Amino acid sequence: NVVTGKRYIKKLVMDGIVDGWDDPRLVSIAALRRRGFTPESIKMFVELCGVSKAQSSVCYDMLEYCIREDLKLKRPRMMAVLDPVKLIIDNYPEEQMEELEIENNLPFGRELYINRDDFMENPPRKYFRLFPGNEVRLMGAYFVTCTGCEKDEAGNVTAVHCTYDPETKCGSGFTGRKVKGTIHWVAAKTAFRAQVRLYENIIDEEKGVYNEDGSLNLNPNSLTVLDDCYLEPALKEAKAYDSYQFVRTGFFCADCRDSKPGAPVFNRIVSLKSSFKLPKPEDCSKTL
């Protein structure tokens, strides 16, 4: 369920729950545009909905399906680490930096950032990413083997250590070796820090749309702001409404209101995957 009534939206704006009529959690045209929805995706959604004389509901997932289908073949794939932890390659030359022969010629060095959930000290079964003794592929770069980690006084991992095999550059030199895990990364020296915003439905569907007093039952986690994300250098030039696929994460758009030259702010448009398969409207659990 999403909020479409003007009376409810006005109250959300007046109470400061959303930052305006174009807040990306809403479904006005201005809000969808700010979030990164394209005209083609909205047209596709309208065509799939069709016209019905009877009262009916439409899957909200269908709207996300349309934008995902429109963007997946159009937008460049970029490296972005949203929950970073440092990865130190102990046997890589300390001052050396190289440009890999991959998209955007991404810089590579001794210290990288990887996603925090790409390392576990005591992993469960079928976890194929970094853990002590395991080898993984750094996307577009080398194979690395985890040797350990550093922790702070609270027991939180502050850095992960590994060694690399120089013969495996860009996917070569590993005949006979099976590496199941591939993770993305950015170089610590060249990546820039940026804010990324993750959006969910503004209505808490598990508790119902309305409270007993008739007010909306709002989702307290409808907006998550990540201030310590590290992105590849090319994304620094992003302008308002520019959209990209962040590898293994989702599709993101530079915010038209808060982005500044050299300091973009990114809104998540939609995640990469969904189980949605164009069901009949009456079978949907989420309605628009």
Model segments located where?
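Catalytic adenosine-cofactor/nucleotide-binding cores of aminoacyl-tRNA synthetases and other
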Residues: 1-288
